[in-house]
Regions:
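Flexible beta-alpha connector loops of hexameric P-loop NTPases
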Residues: 74-80, 118-123, 130-136, 155-160, ...
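Conserved G1/Walker A P-loop phosphate-binding module
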Residues: 1-120, 126, 133, 144-145, ...
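C-terminal-of-GTPase-core extension/linker across diverse P-loop GTPases
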Residues: 2-6, 11, 17, 145, ...
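Long, contiguous hydrophobic alpha-helical segments, chiefly transmembrane helices and signal peptides
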Residues: 89, 95-98, 102, 136, ...
Length: 371
């Protein structure tokens, strides 16, 4: 999974990226300090995997990972090439979802840049969201118009392309009204057509509402955050309250116990990174299954609804091709049997599942196959 972290200059985007990846990307109070996208790979915390590693003491423990990409700052007019716009838009196109960092704090020492890098403008989270949305929408409109032209020409020789042209014409009108592709009302057939266009404003989005420490401590009463949350609810997006500077402080603590105590002192149950990962999984409809043994204990990420052979294919295409069965027990069931697969097997909880089995979150699976 690849998440693109975007935002206008000076909203805390690179600070957040530095914190969640410990990558040390340059963070400065001027536009475009992130010109090439910085990439960081982050392990997905999973207590189930930790427990299996404790039980089996494998040669290798491999968590699922998320790739975060810190994408260059954007200004108004990017879809026409302003700022670093073209590079920004292409980098977004390569991601699975967008984490849009939105400034929800006041600080006269940090410029708020929208259109002019030399102009300090008032903090306006909803306006910032609108600025980036508009650039994505304009880039999408250009793409959709090309698809209309292509489908119209193709329809002269094959009438099946008429439907494609109709759908894209309706979408073009929607985009032209300043609305994102995410909010385009369509049925499953139309959705399948729309998804072939690889549209930027169709990508799932998480709004990371970045606050200072004072604002984050009582974020439910932060007026900026309230506005972002209401917008997210309207468009079916996720919103995550976060303090990037605080996350940076947490990331600098190497000792897990120190981190836990620091979070406890702040009255925070989970770090922003953990909450962002959970948010990403929920947004994209992802789950994890586990493989286990003396050689390796590993977590694998799949889409909800994935059947056993396709889950096996995440490990190796040969296992999918020669799939026979999946010997399965859910982690929670195994723990209810004293943390013993053997005890669970004696109770008949170890199941032999076939090709139609839909893998569940936390399933521990041993795949039988023959090629």
């Amino acid at each position: 999974m690849k998440l693109g972290i975007v935002g206008l200059p000076n909203v805390g985007k690179s600070t957040l990226f530095n914190a969640i990846t410990n990558a040390g990307a340059e963070s400065a109070n001027y536009p475009f300090c992130t010109i090439e996208p910085n990439v960081g790979v982050v392990a997905v915390p999973d207590a189930r995997l930790d427990k299996l590693a404790e039980m089996y003491k494998p040669d290798k423990k491999t968590p699922a990972v998320i790739e975060f990409v810190d994408i260059a700052g954007l200004v108004k007019g990017a879809s026409k090439g302003a700022g670093l716009g073209n590079k920004f838009l292409e980098n977004i196109r390569r991601t699975d979802a967008i984490v849009h960092v939105v400034r929800c704090f006041d600080d006269e020492n940090i410029m708020h840049v929208v259109a002019d890098a030399s102009q300090n403008e008032p903090v306006d989270p909803l306006g910032d969201i609108g600025t980036i949305d508009l650039e994505l929408i304009m880039a999408d409109l250009e793409m959709v118009n090309r698809r209309i032209e292509k489908a119209t020409k193709a329809a002269k020789g094959d009438k099946k392309f008429l439907r494609e042209a109709e759908v894209f014409e309706a979408l073009a009108a929607h985009l032209d009204a300043g609305k994102s592709a995410r909010t385009f009302a369509c049925d499953d057939e139309e959705r399948a057509i729309v998804e072939t266009a690889d549209l930027l404003s169709l990508k799932p989005i998480i709004y990371a509402a970045n606050m200072d420490e004072a604002g984050f401590a009582d974020y439910t009463h932060n007026a900026y955050f309230q506005g972002v949350r209401e917008l997210a609810e309207q468009e079916g997006a996720q919103v995550l309250p976060i303090c990037a500077k605080l996350e940076q402080d947490i990331a600098e603590l190497d000792d897990p116990e120190e981190r836990a105590m620091f979070l406890q002192d702040l009255g925070i149950e989970k770090s922003g990174l953990d909450r962002l990962i959970q948010c990403s999984y929920d947004l994209l409809g992802l789950i994890s299954f586990l493989t286990y043994g003396k050689d390796e204990c590993r977590a694998w990420t799949i889409k909800k609804g994935t059947k056993a052979p396709q889950a096996a294919g995440k490990i190796h295409s040969d296992i999918e091709r020669g799939f026979i069965r999946a010997e399965t027990i859910n982690f929670d069931e195994m723990m209810a049997c004293g943390g013993s697969v053997a005890a669970a097997k004696e109770k008949g909880l170890l199941r032999s599942e076939g090709k139609e089995y839909v893998v569940k979150d936390g399933d521990m699976i041993y795949f039988r196959f023959n090629v």
